[in-house]
């Protein structure tokens, strides 16, 4: 099945300043620990109790670091963590970047990440990682 969750953007004036809504969170899918954040580093709009993203990469707390903020799609491995920015889907704020989204195929032993650029049926970027290779 599919799993959908979200974290608010830093300029989401309703949800980001609301302590009842997680600005950053950890989830687990098929044994992969995933950290979700809008920004890849701390932001001046953060709440006092927000997790600092800088402390997550390479700490062993997450296998996947999923972030946005820059609107630039990318997939890279950093200090044993797969870092993914799906890009953006907001046509009214292109910031010079094409419309993109990420598809994560997660199995207990393997992760395949595809970045699709719209319009288009094929991935622009596709990378596969074995969980055992991240350690």
Language-model regions, residue ranges each:
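Charged phosphate-binding loop/patch that engages nucleotide di/tri-phosphates or the phosphate backbone
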Residues: 107-135
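Short, surface-exposed beta-strand-loop junctions and turns on beta-sheet-rich folds
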Residues: 42-43, 90, 119-122
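Active-site flanking residues adjacent to catalytic metal/cofactor-binding acidic residues
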Residues: 9, 37, 68
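Core dinuclear metal-dependent hydrolase active-site scaffold
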Residues: 26-37, 41, 104
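Short, flexible loop segments at the rims of nucleotide/cofactor-binding pockets, characterized by
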Residues: 12-16, 39-45, 62
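Active-site-proximal loop/helix segment associated with metal-binding centers of metalloenzymes
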Residues: 30-32, 93, 132-135
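Conserved beta-sheet core of the metallophosphoesterase superfamily
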Residues: 5-6, 45-114
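Core catalytic region of metal-dependent phosphoesterases/phosphodiesterases
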Residues: 1-31
């Amino acid at each position: 099945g599919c799993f959908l969750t979200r974290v608010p953007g830093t300029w989401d004036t309703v949800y980001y300043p609301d302590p009842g809504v997680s600005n950053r969170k950890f989830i687990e899918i098929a044994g992969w620990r995933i950290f979700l954040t809008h920004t890849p580093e701390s932001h001046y709009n953060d709440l006092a109790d927000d997790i600092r993203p800088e402390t997550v990469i390479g700490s062993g707390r997450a296998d996947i670091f999923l972030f946005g903020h820059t609107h630039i799609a990318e997939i890279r491995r950093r200090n044993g963590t797969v870092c993914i920015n799906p890009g953006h889907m907001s046509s009214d704020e292109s910031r010079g970047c094409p419309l993109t989204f990420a598809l994560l195929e997660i199995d207990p032993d393997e992760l395949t990440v595809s970045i699709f650029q719209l319009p288009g049926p094929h991935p622009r970027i596709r990378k596969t990682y074995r969980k055992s290779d991240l350690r």
